[in-house]
């Protein structure tokens, strides 16, 4: 049931080695690190996971390893979106086979597909997922697909759709979606507005920075449930100070560097054409890693 998918879900990074190959050992450590820090689930193979610079077989390997390592301890959502419907269907079938709890797909991008073509794309993936709920992934800043509110309302009511990952800064639209669909599982996508997203109606979030400080986001959820707005705001501010630094360094490579200093990821590199972190930021990232490890205890 999609209702079981509510919570704080880390958008999992994909570690690579010096030769740009998948680093399976680091991936396993990262899964365990997230489990140990109290994350509710993992969103695997999305933007943060650098899915679009991986081959289809690599993406399937990542799904298999994560499913094997998580062993039913947390919820697992497989992002299977590709421009190609057939490739998306192949990944969806793999997610079902590996025991994932849901699939997700970004709107098909690059080509100017019609909205009906978008709907057909999702219907085909849902069919291949064989009963797994679909999490529609709306991220207009990266996909270039700017869905209207009416189009979002149509997509989330397709048979088989159980959730929406709303990676948009439009909190008014977030509230409108919640008002229209009170039972929809709704994820906030931008980490820097997590608390605001919850207040606008989100059930939880899917975010990249949860990989290094997921307990802070769980703290925001707890504070808001208790009506403690001041604590929620304080925690969001602390998260945003980290995000300010990561925006300067490049978010994915910055996160991997922090995780490297935490002894979770062996090599802090993203796949090319992404480059490495500028060395001038390394002292700040190392200090951040030490701070977070002390805070976590």
Curated annotation (Swiss-Prot):
User: Could you confirm whether the keyword Lyase appears in this record?
Assistant: yes
Q: Which Gene3D superfamilies match?
A: Aldolase class I
* Residues the entry annotates as binding aceneuramate: 47-48, 167, 189, 191-192, 208
In the UniProt record, does the keyword Translocase occur? no
Q: What is the active site of this protein? A: 137 (proton donor), 165 (schiff-base intermediate with substrate)
Q: Which reaction does it catalyse?
A: aceneuramate = aldehydo-N-acetyl-D-mannosamine + pyruvate
User: What EC number is given for this enzyme?
Assistant: 4.1.3.3
Q: Give the enzyme's main class according to its UniProt record, as a single word.
A: lyase
According to its UniProt entry, the protein's GO biological process terms are: carbohydrate metabolic process; N-acetylneuraminate catabolic process
- Tell me the compartments it is located in: Cytoplasm
CDD domains (UniProt xref): NAL
Q: Which GO molecular-function terms appear in the entry?
A: N-acetylneuraminate lyase activity
Task: List the keywords (alphabetical).
Answer: Carbohydrate metabolism, Cytoplasm, Lyase, Schiff base
Residues of the signal peptide: none
Chief place of localization = cytoplasm
GO cellular component labels: cytosol
According to UniProt, this protein's pathway is: Amino-sugar metabolism; N-acetylneuraminate degradation; D-fructose 6-phosphate from N-acetylneuraminate: step 1/5
Q: What does this protein do?
A: Catalyzes the reversible aldol cleavage of N-acetylneuraminic acid (sialic acid; Neu5Ac) to form pyruvate and N-acetylmannosamine (ManNAc) via a Schiff base intermediate.
How would you summarize the oligomeric state and partners of this protein? Answer: Homotetramer.
Similarity annotation = Belongs to the DapA family. NanA subfamily.
Protein name, please? N-acetylneuraminate lyase
């Amino acid at each position: 049931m999609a209702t079981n998918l509510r919570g704080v879900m880390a958008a999992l990074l994909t570690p690579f080695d010096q030769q740009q190959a998948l680093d399976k050992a680091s991936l396993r450590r990262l899964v365990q690190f997230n489990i140990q820090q109290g994350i509710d689930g993992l969103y695997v193979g999305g933007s943060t996971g650098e899915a679009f610079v991986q081959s289809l077989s690599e993406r399937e390997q990542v799904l298999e390893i994560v499913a094997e390592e998580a062993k039913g301890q947390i919820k697992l959502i497989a992002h299977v979106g590709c421009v190609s419907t057939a490739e998306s269907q192949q990944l969806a079938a793999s997610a079902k086979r590996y025991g994932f709890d849901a699939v997700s797909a970004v709107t098909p991008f690059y080509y100017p597909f019609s909205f009906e073509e978008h709907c057909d794309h999702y219907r085909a993936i849902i069919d291949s997922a064989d009963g797994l709920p679909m999490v529609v992934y709306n991220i207009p800043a990266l996909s270039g697909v700017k869905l209207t509110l009416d189009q979002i309302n149509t997509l989330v009511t397709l048979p088989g759709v159980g959730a929406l990952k709303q990676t948009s800064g439009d909190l008014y639209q977030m509230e409108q979606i919640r008002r229209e669909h009170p039972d929809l599982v709704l994820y906030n996508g931008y980490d820097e507005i997590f608390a605001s997203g919850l207040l606008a109606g989100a059930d939880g979030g899917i975010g990249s920075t949860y990989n290094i400080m997921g307990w802070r986001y769980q703290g925001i959820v707890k504070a808001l449930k208790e009506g403690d707005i001041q604590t929620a705001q304080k925690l969001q501010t602390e998260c945003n100070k980290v995000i300010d630094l990561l925006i300067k360094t490049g978010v994915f490579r910055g996160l991997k560097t922090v995780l490297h200093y935490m002894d979770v990821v062996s090599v802090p590199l993203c796949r090319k054409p992404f480059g490495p972190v500028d060395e001038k930021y390394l002292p700040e990232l190392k200090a951040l890693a030490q701070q977070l490890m002390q805070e976590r205890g």
